[in-house]
A protein has these predicted regions:
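Bacterial N-terminal signal peptides
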Residues: 9-17
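Beta-strand-enriched cores of mature, soluble protein domains
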Residues: 23-166
Length: 166
């Protein structure tokens, strides 16, 4: 059974994610000598509240599993986990997440891991979603890049993935 603070953190996180805008991202700080590519498309996401560890039980954090299906230039599924926190100040929250993506990117098959670290300060969101270095496998070995998630007012999710491959 979920505790009330977990339900509150989960509900506030969902409102945080719904306020995400594509322009609110952290730029890539590394320069990649390879040619850059951009993949775009919609995706579906299922989130499910999970029980926190005993250590974090009274921390005010919320924990959720992520199950995504990407469409478009990235045809893939992903599975991951997220921790979220919402402060007492309305519109201020943050989350971190890790997800392993498995599928094809512009026809190249493999897996890679995305790392999320995003915040919202009094309603102003800032996203950072990057490929974990050296996490690409098979035809995606050497993948580097960042993803931007956009959530339309009706809740439809889409992505823009700027990446490089050797």
């Amino acid at each position: 059974m979920m505790r009330p603070h977990t339900l509150v953190a989960t509900a506030l996180f969902l409102s945080f994610v719904a306020g995400a805008r594509a322009a609110d991202t952290v730029p890539i700080t590394q320069e990649h000598p390879m040619t850059s590519h951009t993949a775009t498309g919609p995706f579906d996401v299922k989130r499910a509240p999970q029980t926190l560890s005993g250590v974090a039980e009274h921390s005010g954090l919320g924990r959720m599993s992520l199950d995504k299906q990407f469409h478009g230039a990235l045809e893939a599924t992903s599975a991951g986990e997220m921790l979220a926190f919402s402060s007492a100040t309305p519109g201020s929250a943050g989350y971190v997440a890790m997800e392993r993506v498995h599928g094809t990117l512009d026809g190249r098959a493999g897996t890679f891991v995305l790392q999320h670290s995003s915040t919202m300060t009094r309603g102003e969101p800032l996203q950072s979603i990057t490929v974990v270095p050296d996490s690409g496998t098979d035809a995606l070995a050497g993948l580097a890049g960042r993803m931007v998630v956009d959530i339309a007012p009706g809740g439809a999710h889409s992505y823009r993935f700027e990446y490089t491959l050797p």
